[in-house]
Structures are given as C-alpha cells and as structure tokens.
Amino acid sequence: MGENMFKKEKVTEYIWTILIPTIITFIISWVGSYYNGTSTVSIGQPTKVSGQYITPINISPYHDIKELRITFPQKLDVKQISSNEPINVKSDKNNIGVESNSTFEIAKIVENNSVQLLITTQKKLNDKEIRIDKNGNNISVNYESQIVNPAKKQLINLIITSSIYFIMLNILALIMNKRWDKYYAKMKNEIKEFEDNAKDLDKKSKKKSEELSELRKTLNQAFEETDRIKYHEKKKQILLLAKLNDYKKELTFWRNTIRKVLYELPDGDKKADKLIGTVTSSLKTYGTVEKNEHDYESLKVAAALLNDSDKRS
C-alpha cells in the first residue's frame, strides 16, 4: 500500500512539475505563433513624387485573404491603384452618405503572396483615415506613423512573455507547495500514528513481561513452599520414627524383664511366650516383633542430622 501511494505521488509530481508546464509553454508558444502569423496590412505615409502623392500599402497574408475592403478619405478611381501582383480590385459604389470617400474590394490575396499597393493622388492622404474592413479575415493593421521602435516592441513582448511565465510558475509553485504541505502533514500524521502504536506495543510488552516475571516469582515461591512442606513432612516422619524407636526400646526392655520374671516360674518359658503373644495379639503390635524390626537406628541418626541442619539455618 505504501509503495503504491509513493508511485502515485511520483506520477502526480511528474504531471504538475513537467507535463503541465510543458503544455502551458506549448500553448503560450502556439498563441504567440498564432498572433505573430496573423496577416498584416501596413499603411505607409504619403510621399510626394513629381507633383503627386504616393501612399504605399503592403499586405502580407499569413492565410488567404478574401474580400478585403479598403476605404480612402478621398474620391479615387481604380486606375489610381497599382499593384506588384495581379489582383482583382473593384470599386464599391454602393456607399451611401460617404460621397467624399472611396471604397475598394480586393477579391482574394493568396497565402504567403505579399502584395504592394501604390495609391497615387493629387492631394495628400491622411494615412490615419485609411480604414481596413477585415471582413472576417485575421488581419492586423499597422500605420507606419504609429509604428514603434522594433526593439521596444520586442522588449514589450519579452516583458509580457516573461510575466506570463513568472505568473504561471508561481501558480504552479503555490499549487506544488500546497500539495507538498498536504503530503507532508499526511506523512507526519502516519509517522505519529506509527510511533504511538509502537509506544503502545512497547507498553503492552513491558506489562506482559512484568506479569510473566511476577508469575515466575509466584511459581518459584510455590515450588519453594512445596519443597519446604515436603521437607518438614519428611522431617516429622523421621522424628516420629525415631521417637517410635525409643518407645520400642523401652517396650523391649519391659518385655525382657517380664520374660525373666516368668522364666523363674514352673513352665515359665511357655507361660512367658503365651503371655507376650496374647498381649501382642490383643494390642495388634506385630511390628514390635524383632524379625519385623526396621533400621530405627539409621532413622534416629537422620533425625539428628535434620535437627543440626535446622539449627545452622
């Protein structure tokens, strides 16, 4: 998921930083080329030659120009118009209320075929009053008297183009900065969330570790308590057996004493065995018979060792 998001951000960054500026540059260049390629009509200033005034008009068609109409502020005849190229020029005599003007229509000027018109008049024409009816053609009209210095015009175009580039780049930079701030904030939140999760897991891990340590401690205490109980039980058992050994010795002493007394009577040995057998049978103390005796001396030694061990601890 993170890798896909990274790729998506890369593609978006490529679109905003490379593709869109390229498209905008292309559009600006295309628009500039379009306007620079517009057909132009340049109207020059009248020049006096041999008592007559000659006014030049240069037509530079970027595309075919159809039905171009030119109106002069004087009454003129078609014969007063000369051209360096064969063109069809006719006078428009349907003008109403403009008797002092003359309008001529050029049927067609072929693309990239520059035409120079020379208008011969007796009176000086006011070039600024010569009107061009574009009639739907993409034409730019320039008056020589108003033409600015080419270097100045180039500088103005350069300033305009640079300003457009500056504005567009700043807009793109602003958009990219906002996108970057948004992406940075998103990554910052994800990192914080990851750190919080890591801290939470660390806390849980420490808690589980403490619980496990406490459980081990409890188990160890239980084992120690069990061992202690077993030890004390064994100790009690050994001590009881040792005490039984003392009782047995005392019982054996009295049995032997009674036996000696009975042996002095007639048939004393039989009477002694019968009496002792009767007592043993009545009390069920068969363990006191010598052949069933255990190693009580060893038990007594073990009990003494346990007592010494307890005293040292």
Swiss-Prot record:
<keyword id="KW-0812">Transmembrane</keyword>
<keyword id="KW-0472">Membrane</keyword>
<feature type="transmembrane region" description="Helical">
    <location>
        <begin position="155"/>
        <end position="177"/>
    </location>
</feature>
<keyword id="KW-1003">Cell membrane</keyword>
<dbReference type="GO" id="GO:0005886">
    <property type="term" value="C:plasma membrane"/>
</dbReference>
<feature type="transmembrane region" description="Helical">
    <location>
        <begin position="15"/>
        <end position="37"/>
    </location>
</feature>
<keyword id="KW-1133">Transmembrane helix</keyword>
<protein>
    <recommendedName>
        <fullName>Uncharacterized protein YddM</fullName>
    </recommendedName>
</protein>
